[in-house]
Amino acid sequence: MRLLPMKEPDRSWRSIKGQWKKDAESVGEDFSTFSTGSFTAYDGLTKEGDHPSLYCLSDGERVHAVCQVSRLMMSKFPSPILRARFILVSPVYELGVADAGQYAQMMVALFSGIVWLSRDTMTASHIRFFLKSPGDAQFFAALQADTSMSLFSKFTIDGALIECSLKEDEMAETA
């Protein structure tokens, strides 16, 4: 799976919602009530077309998740950070079509895509990744271990927030 910008025509929010509507209705869920609330932010951001801060996790055939990614300065960091938040996942994950293991794999793939962005097109040495819930932290707990092979000089999970810093030598290799 790859994290890609949401763009017309095949990765537009409209196209993704169409796919997710079919997914929800395939298990008898009323999409109009299922999507109320959580989809509103994306509807607003895409009202006038593509929005540069929106990304989707795709396997080439389907979109599994979407999130907002921003590169910004924060006072507690000396350089720009990458912030990923407002994660929405396909109804197949929320309605039990996919199992917990598949959900975990998708969330890890999404985080991996954010790390890739931080080393490539949206260069940043610090990442703030807002999980869907504190329960998702279990999928990332092993990354808190301080090992020589780790990409991270710091990796913390507080509630539903992952904060991590890439090792400087890792950043230099991508420059």
Segments and roles (model prediction):
Residues 1-101, 116-128, 142-175:
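Non-catalytic substrate-recognition and accessory regions of acyl/acetyltransferase enzymes
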Residues 100-114:
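Glycine-rich acyl-CoA binding loop
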Residues 131-138:
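Short, internal active-site loops enriched in acidic
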